[in-house]
Amino acid sequence: MTQDYRVLLYYQYVPIEDGESFAQKHLSDCKALGLKGRILVADEGINGTVSGTVEQTNAYMSLMKNDSRFTSTIFKIDEAKQNAFKKMHVRYRPELVNLSLEDDVNPLELTGAYLDPKEFREAMLDENTVVIDARNDYEFDLGHFRGAIRPEIRSFRELPQWIRDNKEQFMEKRVLTYCTGGIRCEKFSGWLVREGFKDVGQLHGGIATYGKDPEVQGDLWDGQMYVFDSRIAVPINQKEHVIVGRDWFDGSPCERYINCGNPECNRQMLASKENEAKYLGACSHECRVHPDNRYIKAHQLSNQEVQERLALLEKDLAS
């Protein structure tokens, strides 16, 4: 008999006094329930993804709802074949979302207008609307809303500077923004309002909610949604599946993520199993020949085998 598992994604902006002590106690509670996952706690709130059996996840939601600070917390629930995490971590951080701002934004005081999935879809179709993806580049590359702008950033904290450098092209437009579950957009949309953007909207509940809406059914989403657990990719569009990801090495359609074999690089890239083997699991020649290449170690390749593959690769690239 197979065990049914679930993955819970949630966040709540709410003041938490002595966040460090709360994080320690919350870790004990999660372990007692048998959960696995990753939770961030800050003085400004909580953000987590946890997985476990139906019984365990139900118990966790009850635990949270019994705390007056989290009675309004919305849990996005995904069915899963197995645990999405190997361990349970609860960590304290100074803030849940880092935009590297001198004067941080409090979403409880300033944030963009909330749009439900149907409203967001309708707004995307307006020609006077621009849609800005508030996630990292590797998340966008796996999947995104059709026509969305891809900021040239490697991390969320680089987004404000990118907006400042490019704001002239959409300052007078209606600006919509979205992210995985909604937490990043709460701050980012508030910052856009503070920067002087007149009409700012955010996808309430994020992509995760959009994909489950029975009417919208993930329409206008291409690719898959990147998630920060062992699943990596989650389907969103229930009407059609358009692959937008491209293999790092040959540009062919691909939705399989790997990390560069060089632990000092660790770049996330899309690659087929064939290309991962051909290129020794590394994004560049420098990373392929790195002495700690994890792909070479994991597959126990001898030095002779490595040299033979490198020679074949050099010949192929030269042709």
Curated annotation (Swiss-Prot):
Which reaction does this enzyme catalyse, per its entry? uridine(34) in tRNA + AH2 + O2 = 5-hydroxyuridine(34) in tRNA + A + H2O
Active-site residues annotated for this sequence:
C179 (cysteine persulfide intermediate)
- What keywords sit in the KW lines? Oxidoreductase, tRNA processing
Domain Rhodanese positions: 125-219
What are the EC numbers?
Answer: 1.14.-.-
Q: Per UniProt, what is one Pfam family of this protein?
A: Rhodanese_C
Which superkingdom heads the taxonomic lineage of this protein's source?
Answer: Bacteria
Provide a Gene Ontology MF annotation, just one. oxidoreductase activity, acting on paired donors, with incorporation or reduction of molecular oxygen
The kind of enzyme this is, by top-level EC class, is oxidoreductase
Q: For this entry, list what GO says about its biological process.
A: tRNA modification
Q: Does the keyword Oxidoreductase apply?
A: yes
Q: Which family does it belong to?
A: Belongs to the TrhO family.
Please give the function described in this protein's UniProt entry: Catalyzes oxygen-dependent 5-hydroxyuridine (ho5U) modification at position 34 in tRNAs.
Q: What is the name of the protein in this document?
A: tRNA uridine(34) hydroxylase
The organism named in the record is: Lactococcus lactis subsp. cremoris (strain MG1363)
Gene encoding it?
A: trhO
